UniProtKB/Swiss-Prot annotation:
UniProt domain THUMP: residue ranges: 61-166
Subcellular location: Cytoplasm
Alphabetized InterPro entries for the sequence: Rossmann-like_a/b/a_fold (IPR014729), ThiI_AANH (IPR020536), ThiI_fer (IPR054173), ThiI_N (IPR049961), THUMP_dom (IPR004114), THUMP_ThiI (IPR049962), tRNA_STrfase (IPR003720), tRNA_sulfurtransferase_ThiI (IPR050102)
Organism from which the protein derives: Bacillus cereus (strain AH187)
Secretion signal, residue range per the UniProt entry: none
Gene3D superfamilies noted in UniProt: 3.30.2130.30, HUPs
HAMAP family on file: ThiI
GO biological process, one term: thiazole biosynthetic process
Taxonomic superkingdom: Bacteria
UniProt binding sites for ATP: L184, L185, H209, F210, R266, G288, Q297
Any Gene Ontology CC annotation: cytosol
Reactions this protein catalyses: [ThiI sulfur-carrier protein]-S-sulfanyl-L-cysteine + a uridine in tRNA + 2 reduced [2Fe-2S]-[ferredoxin] + ATP + H(+) = [ThiI sulfur-carrier protein]-L-cysteine + a 4-thiouridine in tRNA + 2 oxidized [2Fe-2S]-[ferredoxin] + AMP + diphosphate; [ThiS sulfur-carrier protein]-C-terminal Gly-Gly-AMP + S-sulfanyl-L-cysteinyl-[cysteine desulfurase] + AH2 = [ThiS sulfur-carrier protein]-C-terminal-Gly-aminoethanethioate + L-cysteinyl-[cysteine desulfurase] + A + AMP + 2 H(+)
Name under which the protein is recorded: Probable tRNA sulfurtransferase
Length: 404
């Protein structure tokens, strides 16, 4: 029985790139190799237009499951490779068709003759290949407009690829081509989705989480670690910075009027994150803010909070409503972690009536009454940093270490 020997990867948005396209292709190849570390027999060949993954006996379903989370891949096809002879092509097309799962009633044949010296033209090949499938199946018909299965045949010099099973990739651009940002990872539903969407644009992320023991628990801290771990499905690794925020929050609660405490808290977070971004050579800050969702996410609040940093603030969720955000969170695997009932620092000392239209002038006047600089320095100096990698990669490294 013939089996899938290759996976053909299509780039999608990367095809619009010009002179730097080779950088995008190289980064994608590197990301795919990292993602498929568990499969030692595969070989990867990345050309200008697509990528060829030779399976060499590896499980195509297991490989496909990992490929679907790699940004930069538009679609990929499971493919069989056969000699460019009519009978081999017909047999390969039938074998590929028979491996398609589900309720299949209709099909069509698509032929692309890259090898123009092949003795038969496309219009001659279509009935030959389609007829062979019809002769060897039951209750199957041809539908050229809306088929259940499109049997694609690419004819080249010496060999041809046969493809039926087409799957969607994650889209976007390869993580690593767009620089690095610091993402504020709160532990809620929104910020992991913001991190995911930022990575989808080819940007590497490092996460900053503010925790305030004893007001926030170790379980709340572990929840954020688990969220960062879940995000490693979409990149090589996530560096997480855990910032002690207790003294800053206690001082804000004591020195700042309650209506402005939330605004000042967010401004302090931005100042600390900017300091870490400078240390880590990040170029922007990403947040999970959605316009109008809570008091700190009005335009007035954002205008006042933005004042304290010169870094660009990326807000991927800014126009989304909560249901749209939840839908993505469920799809990427972060929702169930985010709804664990452990409070983060944003719920500590929550004011009864936070200002929804805070002014920069007032925020500056309130902050000027107390020197927060030593507290900011202390928070940055005492941060805990950990590097999280895909679970499979960690397991492989531990297995390797056990050998010595």
């Amino acid at each position: 029985m013939m089996t899938y020997e290759y996976i053909l990867v299509r780039y999608g948005e990367m095809t619009t790139k010009g002179k730097n396209r080779s950088k995008f292709v190289s980064t994608l190849k590197d990301n795919v190799k990292f993602k498929l570390k568990k499969f030692p027999n595969i070989k990867i060949d990345a050309t200008h237009d697509r990528m060829y993954i030779q399976l060499n006996g590896e499980d195509h379903e297991a490989v496909s499951e990992r490929l679907k989370d790699v940004f930069g891949i538009h679609k990929f096809n499971l493919a069989m490779k056969v000699p460019s002879e009519l009978e081999d092509i017909k047999k390969g097309a039938l074998a590929a068709f028979l491996q398609v799962k589900g309720d299949v009633k209709t099909f069509k044949i698509t032929v692309h003759r890259s090898y123009k010296h092949f003795p038969m033209r496309t219009m001659e090949l279509l009935p030959e290949i389609g007829g062979h499938i019809l002769e060897n199946t039951e209750d199957i018909t041809v539908d050229v407009h809306n088929p259940d299965v499109n049997v694609r045949v690419e004819i080249r010099s010496g060999y041809s690829y046969i493809m039926c099973d087409e799957r969607m990739g994650a889209g976007g651009l390869p993580v690593g081509v767009g620089g690095k940002v610091m993402v504020l990872l709160s532990g809620g539903i929104d910020s992991p989705v913001a991190a995911y969407l930022t990575m989808k644009r080819g940007v590497s992320v490092e996460a900053v989480h503010f925790h305030s023991p004893p007001f926030t628990s170790e379980r709340a801290k572990q929840k954020v670690i688990d969220l960062a771990q879940e995000l490693t499905k979409y990149c090589k690794r996530v560096t997480l910075h855990l910032v002690p925020f207790t003294e800053v929050q206690k001082t804000i609660n004591k020195e700042i009027p309650s209506s402005y405490s939330m605004t000042v808290m967010r401004r302090m977070m931005m100042r600390i994150t900017e300091r870490i971004a400078e240390e880590r050579n990040a170029l922007a800050i990403t947040t999970g803010e959605s316009l109008g969702q809570v008091a700190s996410q009005t335009l007035d609040s954002m205008h006042t909070i933005n004042e304290v940093t010169n870094y660009p603030i990326i807000r991927p969720l800014i126009t989304m409503d909560k249901l749209e955000i939840i839908k993505i969170a469920e799809e990427i695997g972060t929702y169930d972690i985010s709804i664990r009932p452990y409070e983060d620092c944003c719920t500590v000392f929550t004011p009864a009536s936070p200002a929804t239209k805070p002014k920069r002038e007032k925020a500056n006047r309130f902050e000027a009454k107390y020197d927060f600089t030593p507290l900011i320095d202390e928070a940055v100096a005492n941060k805990e940093t950990m590097v999280l990698q895909t679970v499979e990669v960690v397991a492989e490294e531990e297995k390797f270490e056990e050998l010595f």
